[in-house]
Amino acid sequence: MNIPNKELIQATIFSNCLCNSPYYDLNKLQTDRLNNLVENSRKLSPFYKKKFSYLPDRNVRLEEIPVSTKTELMEHFNSWITNRSLNLSEIKKYLSNTSNIGKPIFDKYLLMESSGSSGTPGIFLHDLKAVEIYHALEASRRANSSLLNQFYWHLYCREKIAYIGALNAHYAGITSICYSKTCYPQLKSTIKELSIYNSKKKLAHSLNIYQPSVVASYPSVAITLAEDQIQGILKLNLREVWVGGESLDQYQKKFIQSAFNAKVFNSYGSSEFPPIAWECDLGRLHVNADWIILEAVDEK
């Protein structure tokens, strides 16, 4: 299950060279990839073949593509997925075993499920070539000043990272960590997972014993930890705090930074596509727009 480092390096070099090239045309790249996606979806997914039947054969524009909700996709799961040998019942059986978290089903697809915050939980399959791209983006496009910029390199092994999240299901965060540890064994001694459902006392005790240099979690958790640090419940000497999965305003960010005297870096992702956007050194979120197009679908 190891992905050769040379493949990561090649994908990373391509990612960087593409963005820095004077011939880089983002609009054209988006259009080409969007049309390839529509073409393959029509070809391999009965659900999309029917839904996209009225679209033109080529030069499809984003605004022409009908919205598909998670409820709709899950109701038509077996005709939605592009691998006809898979079905929802066997995927749910695989997901029900928490020991499978981070282990690709049939050694081909990494499974991620959403929490259902929008009303319906979703299940998403990521082929391992796509995951390679995620790793390349992680390795090449994080803020230059952040330790995140070293995520898959050996230099990173000197850090101690505490990931605080939901560990009891195939959510994007814990799934990505477990799979990354398989691909890059050096991360096994670098990252410690702690359950968000632990009591406040137990979590504080675990963190004080572990003494991480980095904490990664949701903004709401980071704020609670910052309060504990100020009150002396926590005694941590952090270098950075990484947050994502919830909104983070500037006041919250400054509070966390002040409490820990550490840099705070925000990110935005989803189970559908984990590496959507990351924060730069100037505090702005930048979308990986060569791989994803963000669109407002309604007034909410």
Predicted regions and their residues:
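Glycine-rich, histidine-containing beta strand-loop boundary motifs that form or position
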Residues: 125-128, 165, 219, 268-269
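Short glycine/proline-enriched loop/turn "hinge" motifs that connect secondary-structure elements
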Residues: 103-105, 179, 184
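Nucleotide 5′-phosphate-binding alpha/beta core
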Residues: 1-113, 120-151, 155-158, 209-216, ...
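Glycine-centered flexibility sites
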Residues: 116-119, 165, 244, 269
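Active-site glycine/GP-rich loop and adjacent strand/helix microenvironment
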Residues: 1-39, 46, 183-300
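Short, well-ordered, mixed-charge alpha-helical segments that flank or form enzyme active sites
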Residues: 122, 131-134, 169-173, 224-225, ...
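Conserved AMP-binding loop of ANL adenylate-forming enzymes
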Residues: 145-182, 193
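Short glycine- and Lys/Arg-enriched binding-loop motifs that mark or flank ligand-binding interfaces
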Residues: 112-115, 265
